[in-house]
Structures are given as C-alpha cells and as structure tokens.
Regions:
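Basic, helix-initiating cap at the start of DNA-binding domains
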Residues: 1-46, 59-60
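Amphipathic alpha-helical linker/stalk segments
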Residues: 27-34, 63-90
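Hydrophobic alpha-helical connector segments
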Residues: 43, 75-103, 123-126
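Key DNA-contact positions within bacterial/archaeal DNA-binding proteins
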Residues: 49
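HTH DNA-binding helix-turn interface
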Residues: 52-63
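Amphipathic alpha-helical packing segments from all-alpha helical-bundle domains
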Residues: 96, 100, 116-146, 150-154, ...
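Hydrophobic/aromatic-rich alpha-helical bundle segments in the mid-to-C-terminal region
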Residues: 140-186, 194-203
Length: 203
C-alpha cells in the first residue's frame, strides 16, 4: 500500500506548506484567476517541484481550495417549523455562501462540466446542497410520499444552485440581488406546487 508524500516525516511542516498553497490558490481565485499549481507555488513562495508533491494537477489544487461548509444544516437553533420559511432561510443562506466565494464556485462548476474530470470529489461537495434542502423540508416527511419529496428536492436543487445563479447573472443579465430573489421565488413556487398537487385527490 503506497503512502502519500504528506503522510511521511515532518508532517507539521508539510501541513503548513499545503495550507500555504491552498491559501495562495484561494487568494488568486478571489482576484478572478484560475490558478495553476505553478502560480500557487509562486504566490506561496514554494518551489514548483514541492508544490507538485502536494497537488498532482490543477484540479486537485482547485478542489482543495474550494471553501468547506461542513455544517449539516443551514438552519439555526431557532429554526421555524413552517416548511416554506425553513426553505427560504436555506436558500438565502446558500446564496450567501455562493456570493462570498463566487469565483471558487464558478471554477468548481466549470470543472464539473469538463470532460475527463475526476467527478468523485466534485460530486461529494455538490451533494451537500441536497442535504440542506432535505433538512429544510424535514416537516414534510410525513406529509408527502417519499417519491414526491425526492422529486421536490431535486427540482429545488436545480433552481437554487450555483448553476442557477450563473445563468441568471450571466445569461439573463440580472443583478446578483435580483438573481437571489428569483431563486427564492422559484423554490417557494416549487414547494407550493408540490403541496397543492399532493392535496388533489387521485381518481
């Protein structure tokens, strides 16, 4: 079984070097750049050869530089019980996460669309959006059949993701504030439609 470079000797020093490379990449991303391993190495004052021991390619670096949001819920301790209010709070919080690190999220979106990308890590990160939506809709677990709830989660995920934000801003020409308003409206509309549909008796 092979051992990674970072797991051999001088781990503290290697952890600091890796952190410096990641921070350099994040700083470059905030400036609108899509940093290569070489560019991050220069910015972090690390040799090119050393940088490649930590990140084999640009994608590995960019995945590491992507901001981590580890929380299992975007709702606070005093979260409302109403599903629509909960969903709106999650959409608003998620939009703020996107806007605070927009360039990084745009980069991850581009990577996910590139042919030949390693989708394992990318898919794992995108999956958090679904967890947060399910958390918002938790009060509906006993109200909607599992299949209908799953369909609603998928529909909302499409309407409020970074993909939606990029489309509304870049293609529709909306301001970011207006784009977020549309995302919130879309989520509410989908929820109300699902609830109305479930209330209609089947023949």
């Amino acid at each position: 079984m092979s051992i990674s470079y970072e797991e051999t000797g001088r781990r503290s020093q290697k952890a600091r070097t890796r952190a410096a490379l990641v921070e350099a990449a994040r700083e470059l991303l905030t400036r609108g750049r899509t940093p290569t391993v070489e560019e991050a190495a220069i910015a972090a004052s690390v040799s090119r050869a050393t940088a490649y021991r930590y990140f084999a390619n640009q994608q590995a670096l960019l995945v590491a530089a992507h901001p981590e949001v580890e929380t299992a819920s975007l709702l606070g301790m005093d979260a409302p019980s109403d599903p629509e209010e909960r969903l709106d709070a999650v959409v608003t919080a998620l939009a703020r996460i996107f806007l605070d690190a927009e360039q990084s999220y745009r980069t991850m979106l581009r990577l996910s669309l590139e042919t030949g990308s390693d989708r394992g890590e990318l898919s794992l990160r995108k999956g958090r959006r679904y967890l947060w939506i399910r958390d918002a809709l938790a009060p509906l677990r006993d109200r909607l059949p599992r299949a209908e709830l799953d369909r609603l989660v998928h529909a909302i995920a499409v309407a409020i993701g970074i993909e939606a934000l990029v489309t509304l801003v870049d293609l529709a020409g909306l301001s970011r504030r207006r784009a977020v308003e549309v995302m919130r409206w879309s989520a509410r509309a989908l929820l109300r439609s699902a609830l109305a549909e479930s209330a209609v008796p089947t023949r």
